[in-house]
């Protein structure tokens, strides 16, 4: 009889553990569900606050408002003398938190002089 009781306690403990894990997963899923999506305006504000001398910013949500795919163009003299990699890193650092929620992200960075040659 003592052996049966110990076995039942083990089963109950396993059930409690599995129930606890399931509950944790549901709470995590619920928390993810209520997060605000990334917006064009939010990305624009983050970039403007992090990168000095911003001349022009174009943020386009390619996911039709879902906040999952963005195309960004940043024009600033801050990029003068910096390689494409360093420019992209500066923008990525500015939107680091938002990048965790985004599925696709494209960024093009130009100086004012380079931008004036592109846009005629």
Curated annotation (Swiss-Prot):
Its main location: cytoplasm. GO terms for cellular component: cytoplasm; cytosol; iron-sulfur cluster assembly complex; nucleus. Involved in the regulation of the iron regulon in response to decreased mitochondrial iron-sulfur cluster synthesis. May be involved in mitochondrial organization and biogenesis. Interacts with FRA1, GRX3 and GRX4. Gene3D superfamilies: Phosphatidylinositol 3-kinase Catalytic Subunit, Chain A, domain 1. This is BolA-like protein 2. The keyword Nucleus applies. One of its GO terms (biological process) is intracellular iron ion homeostasis. Belongs to the BolA/IbaG family. The keyword Iron does not apply. Pfam families: BolA (PF01722). Present with 2050 molecules/cell in log phase SD medium. It is found in: Cytoplasm; Nucleus. GO terms for molecular function: 2 iron, 2 sulfur cluster binding; iron-sulfur cluster binding. Keywords: Cytoplasm, Nucleus. PANTHER family: BOLA-LIKE PROTEIN 2, BOLA-LIKE PROTEIN-RELATED.
């Amino acid at each position: 009889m003592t052996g049966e009781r110990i076995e039942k306690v083990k089963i109950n403990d396993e059930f409690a553990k599995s129930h606890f894990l399931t509950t944790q997963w549901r709470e995590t899923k619920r928390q993810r569900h209520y997060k605000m999506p990334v917006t064009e305006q939010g990305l624009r504000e983050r970039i403007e606050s992090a990168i000095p001398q911003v001349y022009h910013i174009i943020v386009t949500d390619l996911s039709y408002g879902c906040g999952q795919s963005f195309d960004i163009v940043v024009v600033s003299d801050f990029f003068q003398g910096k390689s494409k990699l360093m420019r992209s890193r500066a923008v990525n650092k500015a939107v680091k938190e938002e990048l965790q929620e985004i599925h696709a992200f494209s960024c093009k960075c130009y100086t004012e002089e380079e931008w004036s040659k592109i846009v005629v």
